[in-house]
Amino acid sequence: MQIHALMLADSAQAVDGKLYILGGAWNVLRFPEFPAQLLVGIAVAIDVDWNETNRRHHLDVHFEDADGNKMDPTIGADFEAGRPPGAVAGADLRIVFAVNGPLAIPGPGSYSAVASIGGEELARSRFQAVQASRSN
């Protein structure tokens, strides 16, 4: 099993096996002051190996600061990829997830969204939070 995509966005939706992303793939956020609050969309696409289908798995996504300290929120989801009629034997099956919610950024620095399945880290999306310069 592997994570095909882990993307941070302004908004994300998962509909009919597709991810819809608005304002995605950013890696630098500018804030006039800290602590800062934003709404973040998290989009995840998972390729499930044929031999791992028809079994329950658990996805966890959490945020970390540069020192590896976990931050709220932590998001979890159980999933199972079933083999649909007509699926090619041996082919991976893709599962998509999207969630939107608040994220508090305590100060300038480096942060990561970390995705794990069954306790194994499979993807990391890094970003920087910087102080926006004030215009006169």
Residue ranges and their predicted role:
Residues 2-117, 121-136:
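Contiguous segments within soluble domain cores/interaction surfaces
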